[in-house]
Every structure is written in C-alpha cells, then in structure tokens.
Swiss-Prot record:
InterPro entries: Beta-prop_EML-like_2nd, CFA-57, Quinoprotein_ADH-like_sf, WD40/YVTN_repeat-like_dom_sf, WD40_rpt
Entry's localization field: Cytoplasm, Cytoskeleton, Cilium axoneme
Protein name, per record: Cilia- and flagella-associated protein 57
Job of this protein: Associates with components of the nexin-dynein regulatory complex (N-DRC), a key regulator of ciliary/flagellar motility, and might act as an inner dynein arm (IDA) hub or linkage.
Length: 1250
C-alpha cells in the first residue's frame, strides 16, 4: 500500500435527498449525510467525526437510527447491488455491526427503513416495481416476513414501527395508508383504507395506536387503529403585496369519508411554477415529527407548524408557526424562504428542533423561543452556516490566508476558513458561476460567470466587482503563483491578463476543443493546458507560443498538473489512465482500474499525488508513481469529483464534487506525521475596506455617540425622579408596617396569656386523671390476686387426679399387651390355613386370565379391521371433495383469463395515452426553445437597464448630498425638540403628584367601605357561632348521658359474664347462661338491622344472578345455533363412535374385573389385607369368640380417644369466643389471669367413658 495517508478533517455540505437525513445522537451531537459519509457533528464544540460509506458505494439512499440511539442503518447501492449496513454508534470509531446484502428476493434498492422499539428488528421498504416490505431479525440476518405492499408501481415514501409494539407497522405512499401486524411469520394488513386514496407523503406515531399523516394537498389526518378521527387542511394565502398568511381552513371529525384528492405528488419545480400562476396554492407536508406536547409538520415552502393536543379532546390545534428567514445576502431575498422542509427532528430533551431543506440547508430553533414569540411567527437560524445547494464548479485557495473560495451552479460564491472551519463570506448573483480563482494575497478573486469574467475585491463584509471582461461562460480561470497575472479560458482560447494594468497581454490559441484545465508552473513562465480535443500544450508566456504539445484524439482530458520542477506534466482523462508527459512524449500510462480520473494534484514537495475519480473516491499515491496497484483509496463524495487542491504548505487536501459538498483532508507521510513546511510569516489578518464605508461608519458612530449621551442624560433624570418617588413609598410602607408590627405584638401577648391559662388547666386535669387511674389499678390488682389463689388451689387438685389416672392407664396397657400377643398367635395359625386354600384358587384364576387374554386379542383384531374400513370410507369421501375443488379452480382460471384480456385492452389504452403525452412533451420542448430565445432578449434588456441604473446612481449621489443638508437641519430641529421636552418634563412631575394623590383618596374611600362590610360580616359570623355553640353544648350533654347509660350497661354485663365464668367446666349450664345473656342484652332491633342487611345482600345477589342467567341464556342460544349448523355432519360419525365406545367399555369392564380378581389373589398371597369379621365367622365360627374379644377392646379405646379429642376442640373453641367477647366489650379484668389446665378433667372424662 501507499505510504501517503489522508484523513477526513471537515466537510461543508449536506445531501438532503437521502431519506431521514438528520438525527440526534445525544443532546449535543447530530448525524447527517454529506458526500459518501455520515457526519457526527457536535453543535457546541463544532467538531466532526465521520462514518464512511461502504467500499465502491454509489451513494446513500436512506438512514435510520435505533430508538436506543445505539445503531445506525444505512441503505446503499454497492456495485449496482443493494445493501444495508448497520453501524454501532457507541464504539469509537463507529464499527460495522452487520451487513445485509444477500437476498433471496428481487430488490433494486431500499428507500425507507425503521428500527423496532427494542432495536432488535429492522423494517425495510424496497422501490417499485417490487415494492416489498421486509421484516428482519437483523442480528441473525434472518428475514422474519416479507410482503408486497403495492402492485400498481406507486411510490412508497415511509415505513415505521409503533413506538411500543414490535409487531405493528405503518406504511404510507401515493394512494396508500396501511397498518400491518406481524403474526405467525407473516405481515397481515389490519386496517383497510376507506374513502378516496390520498398521496400520503409523511406520517408519525403520536401514541401507541394513533398516527398523524400528511398529504401533498396540505391535509393532516389523525388515524386511531386505522380509523380516521380528525382532519385539518392548511392553506397558504399569497396576497399581491408579497405577505403570506397560513390558516387552518377546514377541520372535521369525519370517521367514514375521506375528502377529495387532487393531483399526485408534483416535483419541486412544478410546485414553484404553479404557485407563481395562482394566488392560492396547497402546501405539501413533506415531514412530520412528534414530541411530548403534539407534533411539528412542514407546511409548504419555508414553513413549519407546531400542533398541540387539546386537553378536553384527542384532537390537535395549531399553536405556533416557524419560518425560514429571508436571506439578506441573496440576490433575490424573496426566494430564500421558498425551500421545502424535507426532514424534522427534535433533540432528546425536546429543547431544539432541527430541519433540513430541499436546498441542502440545516436550520435549528430553540423551542423556548417559539413560546416567547406568541403573536408573530418565530424564525429558524442556520445550524452551522449556509451551504451550497448545487454542484460546485470552482475551487481555489491562497497563500497569505487560510481561505477556500468556491463557486457553484446555485449562483453563489462562498469563502471558507479551513483553520476555524467556518464560512467567512458569501454572496449570491443572478448568473451561474463556472470557475473561480483566489489571488495569493487573499484580497482579490476572479470569477467566470455565464455572461462575463469579473475581477472582484474581497471586502470585510462584501464582494464587489471592479473590472469586467466580455468572456462568456469561462470554464477555467487561474491566478499565477506570483499573483501578477491571471489566465481565463474562453472556449478554446486562453486569455492572459495582468493584475496591475488589468489589460489582456496575450491570447493563446491552438486548441480545437473546449479547454478543461490550465495550470501555471512554479516560476509563472509557462502555462499548461488540456482539453476535450485530446491535446496537452505547454505555452511560453514571454513569446505566446507553444513549446511542447502532446495530442491523443482518442482521449478527452479532464485535468492536468505539473511537477514542481516543471519537467513532467501529469494528465488524466476519459481513457481510464494517468499519463506522464515530458518533452511532448508520453513516458508512462498507469491504469485507473475501471474508473475515470476526473481531477489530479501533486504536492509542492513533489512526493505525493492525489487523484479524484468519477465515483467520488480519492486515491493517494507516492511519487515517483509505482507500476503496481499501490495506492490508498478513500470514500469521499457521492458524485464525480470536479476539483482538487493542496494548500501551499501541503498540510491540507481540498476536494469538491457534483454533490455540492466540500471536504478538507489532513495529509500525512509514511510515518504518520503531517508533512510540515516551515512558514516564515503567519497568515495575514488584514482585510479590505472602502473609504466610503469607513466614512459612513464613522458618521454613524458619531451619531450613535451623541444619541448615547442624550439617552444618558434622559436616563439620569428619570432615575432621580424614580428615586424620589420610591423613597417616599418606602417611608410610607415602613410606617405602615411598624403599626402592623405593634398590633401583632399586642395580639401575640394576649395569645400567650391565654395559652398559659390553658396549660394550667390541662395540667390539673391530667393530674386528676392519673390519680383516678392509679386507684382503679390497685382495685383491679386486689381482685385478680384473690382469683389467682382460688384458681391455684383448683389446679393442685386436678394435678393429683391426673397422677392417679396415669397409674391406672399404665396397668391397663400391660394387660392389653398380654392379650394382644395371644390374639396374634391365634391369627397366624388361622391365616396359614387360609393361605393354602387361596394358592389353589390363584392357580385356577391364572388359567382363566390366560383364556381371557386370548379372547381379548381376537376382539382387538376385529376392532382394527373395522377402523380400517371406516378410514377407507372417509378417504373416498374427501377425494370426492378434492375433485369438486379442482373443478371449481378450473372454472376460476377461465374467469382470470377473461380478466387478463380486459387488462391487456386497458394496457393498450394506457400506451396510447403515453404516446399522446410524448407528443405533448415534444411540443413542450419547442415552447422551451422559444422561452430560451425570449430569455436572451430579456438579458439584453437587463444590460440596458443596468446602463440606465448607472445614470440613476449619479442622480442618487446628488440626492445624497441634499439629504446630508437635510440631516444637519434635522439635528438643529432635534435640539429644539429636546429643549421643549425638558420643559414638559418639569411640568409633568407636579401633574403626576396631583394624579397620585387623587388615586390615594379614592383607594382610601374604597378601603373604608370594605371595612364597613367586613364589620357587618363579622357580626353575623359571631351570632352564627354562638348558636352553633349552644347546639353543641346540648348535644354534648346528650352524649354524656348516653355514655353514663352505656357504662352502667357494661358493668351489669361484666357482672353477669363473671357469673357465667363459674360454670365454665359445665357446658350445659354454661350454654343456658350464655343464652340468657343473649336474650337479656341483644335487642330485636339489632336482629332486624342484620336481617335487613341480609335482604339487601340477597336482592343484590339475585340481581347479579338474573344478569348472569340472561347472559348465559344468550350464550346458550348462540351455542345451539352454531351446534345446529355443524350437527348434521357429525351425527353419523357420532353414532358409529357410540357403538365402538360401548364395545370398548364392555371390554374395559371385563378387563377391570379380571384385574381386580388378580389383585385380590395377589393380596391374599402377600398378606396385604385383613380378613373381615363376617368372613371369619363364615369360615370358622368356632374361633369367633376368641378373635372378637381383643379387637372389641381396641375399638372402645379408639372411640374414647376420639371423644376426648372432640371435647378438647370444643373447649378450645369456647375459650376463643370468650377472648373475642373480652376484646369487643373492653373487659380486660381477667386478661392477666391464667386458668388451670384441663388435663385432669379430661382424664376424668376419659375414665367415665371407659
């Protein structure tokens, strides 16, 4: 590889026709396409980082950034094949994550893309005629679904995902608005368009299921789940005075019908032509962007509207208008705002809105400014600087300043600073500029326009022409290295002029074709030229003759350059080679490898060479040139490179192309270091200013100074007046506040005394309550101690009883063990005899089982044969159905043939219409020729107008002198006016004081009336409060009486409950006592309330039940209807199945019976089951009495244990009920008493049962 390295440093340009051409990476960094790169631009720090396109790419078509701002998808055409490259933006530098370029479906290019909300899926739309929508799992390069969106070759403009749902997709285009859902591996359309189709240009999701769509007729629609919910139309009114007003003219809530549609999407030129003929034109909505409050949309040329959501409805209303400002540097300022907004993007915090336009410009606006300017529309600002909007035709640089000069077919000249990466100066003209050259000093330029060659001064804020030459369509011009000469090409002739006398000193003739490139040698003694005639000439300027020539008619040269020693000429052209020419001979030809070289430049050191290609790449080579393919190739532009230059110090490479972009590159040698050339003098900072401009500015400064002095005096006087007024107001306020403070102090003192009284009262009350509580506690402790002593004595007695019962139970257990051992011996003898009998029976049963298994196999075979016959019948039935379906398909094919014939006839009609259109186009071309001839006449008239303008300027100078005299008289008038104003100001303070005093008197009278009203209101409030106080006193007395009654009731209940506790060991008496308590204390009214509540619940229950029964009845009817529809098909099959199931059930019963017999026999063998008492009595009645005695005793013990357990559970339940009653009534006196254990009583109960 070559040792010469070029690194992208900065780019000036934008490719606005890439779909989705601007994004925010974060709050400071935006991403946009420029050349064949994507640029990450930091708005605050002004740096750029680059994501280059793919190798051999023919340019980017569409971009998409993932919602998590981690991935960037780029659609390109690489070697005439479509490809999608996905970059990871978080890595530094950005690296390729995936490349999607192997497709098993037809595709020409991808025109729109979108990432899913979780960034895992990618949606891509192909161009017509395929118009396929592809749904990718891009990490695995897997196509999840593909569907054809349109079959009529209508363009599709945009695809997108729902912001919350990976499976929901929206597609808009000419005559189509489709919502699709990904399910079961396919994309299915979920909504179908109603009404007449519109040309939908753009859309955005404003909610999970709501979409705003814009059309080419200025209409906005809101769709919710595919149904139209809202519609509005935007109209641009263009009155004759040039002002425009933007009005919403129609708003409806139509849900069914769409409004009528006009013509399909026109081009930008057609739209401008149409608007010039009519006073009313419909704006086209090219871009829509959603944000938290609503959405922003483009509304015709140079305008953006903000819509906000209405609070009470799900509709939107226009809230703000933002315009592209008029450009004062433009030749026609009215045209500067007539550019369509193609893309809109909000920053992540929604503080900034960025827009890109059809003229390759980037604008931004801070959203807070739109809120400030409520009355009038807000205006955009340039995000960076104005950019070229057409191919760059000329490129130049100088020695004394870091300037780059460019000219373009957009009729503008721009000067850039490659050190600060800013735009220094620009100006637009009426004619297109084809070539430009910058003087080495940086103070002059020469520009070749369509009509003339102009020599211009570069002033501090303007570019002014001071000499014109009648050279039409000058394609190349160049200052000499010394700056004393410049050359300009006029067709096939080179004119050489001197910059001192500005005269033509030589005309170099010899080319037979158009000259494409000229270059000076180092000492300006020679000029080298190359042209389309295949000739490269070296001219001697002192003689004006050719010194060397090299002619190759098969090659059309695009660019030539010369080595620093002027011995070798390098030329590139249409024959795909780079030629070294010396002494009229071609020394070497180096292949360009399937591309055409369009530009070439060699460094001043002679060690590096750079060439530009027709595909937009640059190649860096070392010199002398190698024979092999040894160079570094870099992706640069999206079109052929038109111009290339190296700065004088060989530090920077400059490239310009037909895509309207300008790149600056940093150049390095083989060690990676910049190629440094020592500069003896730094860059110049001087600028040119005309004398008249300086005088005007000085005059303006003097006027402003006098105005500043006058304003100072005026402000000082106003300040003094304000100080006096404010000092008086402060004094009044201080007096007022002092009085208020004193009144508040007295109030505070009164409140303190009241607080102290209340504190004393509360303290005494608390002490009384504490004494009362302590006395009650002592009483309760005495009662509890006595109860505890009684319970402890009971507990001792019960413990003695439990010991005696435990000894008796141990004796019974020993007796039971002895009887158990005897019973076991008797049972073993009995079961051994029984076992012998069962073995014989088991052998017999096994033989029976074998016989039954054989019978089962035979029945199984019969069932299988019956099933096979049934399957065969079903097969014949469905084959018959298949034949019927095939016949219906053949019938439908015949119908499709008829439809195809109709389609072919319609196609012929379409072809006839296209022929008519072609004839009309021919007539249009003729008319355009007439228009061009008329335009030439107009240019001649313009020249006459210009000459008359010069005479007018002379007259205007005289008028200017008279205006100066008028200004002097105006100044004298101004002094007199000032004196009059001062006298008026002396009178004004007295009048102001009188007016202020009158206002104060009126305010005091109003305050007095307010005080009277407040007094009357307060008196009424006091009477109301006294009445309320009396009512509350009476109510308090009633409540206290109720409280005393309840306390008495609670005491009576406690005593009765205490009496009940004495019967806690006797359940029957306890039950009677509790019933008595219930009858005594529970009133019937309570029961009635409970019953009423139960009846309400019952009514609610029955109402709900009736509602459910009605629903169930309707559902049953539906089920019955559906069952009747399908019942006839299944009746026969069900009858056959029933017969088969019956046979299978009978076989299962027999099998179950045999299995149970086998299981019983096996259990008998293994002694797993016990013999029932009845069976034992039948087999051996003699041993019945011996076996039943111990078992009966065991059953009695189990029963007594069960009874004890049940009684224990009942006691526990009663205890829980007592605790709940204590918690409800607040009876806590027995809370600390621990009752004795009931184990002894339970033991007594067990003894009694035994």
């Amino acid at each position: 590889m070559s040792a010469v390295v070029a690194q992208t440093l900065h780019v000036f340009g934008l490719r606005s026709h890439v779909a989705n051409n601007i994004f925010y990476f974060d709050e400071q960094i935006i991403i946009f396409p420029s050349g064949n790169h994507c640029v990450k631009y930091n708005v605050d720090q002004k740096w750029q980082k680059f994501i280059p396109g793919s190798e051999k790419s023919q340019g980017m078509l569409a971009l998409s950034i993932s919602p998590n701002r981690r991935y960037l998808a780029i659609s390109e055409t690489v070697q005439e094949k479509p490809a999608i490259t996905i970059y990871e933006l978080s890595s530094i530098p950005c690296r390729k994550r995936k490349v999607l370029n192997n497709f098993d479906f037809q595709v020409q290019k991808f025109i729109s893309m979108a990432f899913s909300p979780d960034s895992k899926y990618l949606l891509a739309q192909t161009s017509p005629p395929e118009s396929n929508l592809v749904y990718w799992l891009w990490e695995k390069q897997k196509v999840m679904a593909i569907v054809r969106i349109d079959t009529q070759n209508n363009p599709v403009y945009q695809v997108s995902f729902s912001p919350q749902d990976n499976t929901q997709v929206c597609v808009t285009g000419n005559g189509m608005f489709k919502l699709l859902r990904f399910a079961e591996g396919t994309l299915k359309q979920t909504s179908f368009q109603r009404g007449e189709p519109q040309n939908y240009l753009a859309h955005t999701w404003v909610a999970d299921d709501k979409i705003v769509v814009g059309t080419d007729t200025g209409k906005l629609f809101l769709f919710e789940s595919g149904d139209q919910r809202w519609e509005t139309s935007i109209m641009v009114k263009e009155p004759t005075n040039g002002s425009k007003s933007l009005d919403v003219i129609q708003e409806s809530e139509s849900l069914i019908e769409f409004p009528p549609v006009s013509s399909p999407l026109p081009s930008y030129e057609q739209m401008v032509a149409a608007s010039s003929h009519s006073q009313m034109s419909m704006p086209q909505v090219f871009a829509i962007a959603a944000y938290s409050k609503g959405f922003a949309c483009s509304a015709g040329p140079g305008r953006v509207l903000l819509f906000e959501k209405m609070e009470e409805k799900d509709f939107y209303r226009e809230s703000r208008e933002i315009r592209i400002p008029v450009d004062p540097q433009s030749n026609d300022p009215s045209q500067s705002d007539k550019q369509d907004v193609l893309c809109l993007c909000f920053s992540p915090s929604e503080e900034t809105l960025v827009a890109s336009t059809s003229k390759n410009q980037l604008y931004s606006i801070t959203m807070s400014l739109t809120e400030i300017s409520k009355g009038e529309p807000a205006h955009f600002e340039y995000l960076m600087y104005p950019l070229h909007s057409a191919p760059i035709t000329g490129l130049a640089t100088c020695i004394r300043k870091p300037l780059i000069a460019t000219c373009s077919l957009d009729r503008s000249i721009r000067l850039w600073n490659y050190e600060t990466n800013t735009l220094e100066l620009f100006k637009e003209y009426q004619e297109e500029a084809y070539s430009i050259s910058l003087h080495p000093s940086g103070h002059f330029i020469v520009v070749g326009f369509a009509d003339k060659l102009r020599l211009m001064n570069l002033l501090i804020d303007d570019i002014r022409s001071f000499k014109e030459y009648s050279v039409r369509g000058c394609g190349e011009c160049s200052f000499s290295n010394g700056g004393h000469l410049f050359a300009a090409v006029n067709g096939n002739v080179i004119h050489v002029y001197t910059t001192t006398s500005l005269e033509n000193i030589s005309s170099l003739k010899g080319h037979t074709g158009k000259i494409r490139s000229i270059v000076w040698n180092a000492d300006d003694s020679k000029l080298i030229s190359g042209g389309t005639d295949g000739a490269v000439y070296e001219w001697n300027l002192s003689t004006g003759k050719r010194e060397t020539e090299c002619v190759l008619k098969s090659c059309s040269y695009n660019c030539v350059t010369v080595s620093p020693d002027a011995k070798i000429i390098f030329a590139v052209g249409s024959d795909h080679t780079l030629k070294e020419i010396a002494d009229s001979l071609i020394l070497r030809e180096i292949s360009a490898f399937d591309v055409t070289y369009t530009a070439i430049v060699i460094s001043h050191s002679g060690r590096m060479m750079f060439v530009g290609t027709s595909v937009g790449t640059i190649r860096a080579m070392k010199y002398p040139l190698p024979l092999q393919k040894e160079f570094n190739e870099y992706q640069a532009h999206a079109g052929p490179i038109t111009k290339m230059l190296l700065t004088f110090d060989d530090q920077f490479l400059l490239t310009a192309a037909e895509d309207g972009c300008l790149f600056t590159w940093k150049v390095f040698d083989k060690d990676g270091r910049g190629i440094k050339r020592e500069r003896e003098v730094g860059f110049a900072e001087e600028v040119l200013v005309t004398k008249t401009d300086m005088e005007e500015k000085a005059q303006v400064m003097l006027e402003l100074k006098t105005r500043v002095e006058e304003l100072k005096m005026e402000n000082e006087y106003q300040l003094r007046l304000k100080d006096m007024n404010y000092s008086e107001k402060i004094k009044e306020l201080t007096d007022k506040f002092i009085q208020e403070m004193e009144s508040l102090k007295t109030k505070n003192q009164v409140l303190r005394t009241e607080k102290e009284k209340q504190d004393v009262y509360h303290h005494e009350h608390i002490e009384d309550l504490l004494d009362k509580q302590s006395r009650e506690l002592q009483d309760m402790e005495c009662c509890n101690n006595q109860k505890l002593l009684l319970e402890y004595e009971k507990y001792q007695e019960l413990q003695l009883k439990s010991q005696r019962m435990q000894e008796e139970y141990e004796k019974q257990l020993r007796d039971n063990d002895e009887t158990k051992s005897q019973a076991l011996e008797e049972l073993t003898e009995f079961y051994e005899a029984k076992l012998q009998e069962k073995t014989t029976l088991l052998e017999e049963a096994q033989e029976d089982v074998r016989q039954q298994l054989r019978e089962f196999e035979e029945t199984k075979k019969q069932i299988e044969e019956d099933e096979d016959r049934e399957i065969q019948d079903i097969k014949t039935k469905y084959e018959k159905k298949l034949r019927d379906e095939k016949e219906s398909n053949l019938r439908l094919k015949g119908e499709t043939g008829i439809m195809r014939k109709k389609f072919s006839s319609l196609q012929k009609e379409i072809e006839e219409r296209t022929n008519d259109i072609e004839t009309l186009k021919g007539e249009q071309m003729k008319l355009q020729g007439v228009i061009k001839s008329l335009e030439k006449d107009i240019q001649g008239l313009k020249r006459e107008i210009q000459e008359r303008d010069e005479t007018i300027q002379d007259k205007e100078k005289r008028i200017y002198d008279l205006k100066k005299k008028n200004q002097e008289l105006g100044k004298f008038k101004f002094v007199l006016d000032y004196k009059i104003k001062e006298l008026k100001k002396q009178i004004e303070p007295r009048e102001n004081e009188i007016r202020v005093m009158k206002e104060q008197i009126q305010e005091m009278e109003a305050e007095l009336e307010n005080f009277h009203k407040q007094n009357t209101q307060l008196e009424l409030n006091i009477t109301e409060l006294w009445q309320k106080l009396r009512a509350t006193d009476q109510e308090m007395r009633r409540e206290r009486q109720k409280e005393r009654d309840l306390e008495a009731l609670v005491k009576r209940f406690k005593t009765d409950l205490h009496n009940c506790v004495a019967y806690i060991q006797e359940p029957r008496l306890l039950k009677e006592k509790v019933r008595g308590l219930f009858e005594k204390y529970v009133q019937r009214a309570d029961m009635v309330e409970i019953a009423g509540l139960n009846t309400d619940l019952q009514q609610e229950y029955t109402r709900q039940r009736e509602h459910l029964e009605r629903n169930l009845a309707t559902l049953k009817k539906k089920v019955v209807k559906e069952g009747e529809l399908h019942r006839t098909d299944y009746v026969r099959i069900m009858q056959e199945n029933v017969s088969l199931i019956k046979e299978i059930n009978e076989l299962r019963r027999e099998l179950k019976f045999t299995r149970s017999q086998v299981y019983d026999l096996e259990a008998a063998l293994k002694l797993t089951k016990k013999v029932r008492p009845q069976e034992v009595s039948e087999t051996e009645p003699s041993r019945d009495m011996l076996s039943t005695a111990p078992t009966a005793r065991l059953n009695e013990q189990e029963e007594t244990g069960r009874i004890i357990e049940m009684q224990r559970l009942e006691i526990q339940r009663l205890r829980d009920q007592i605790q709940e009653q204590e918690q409800v009534t607040g009876f806590h006196t027995l809370a600390g008493v621990r009752l004795p254990s009931l184990s002894n009583s339970e033991v007594d109960l067990e003894v009694k049962t035994n």
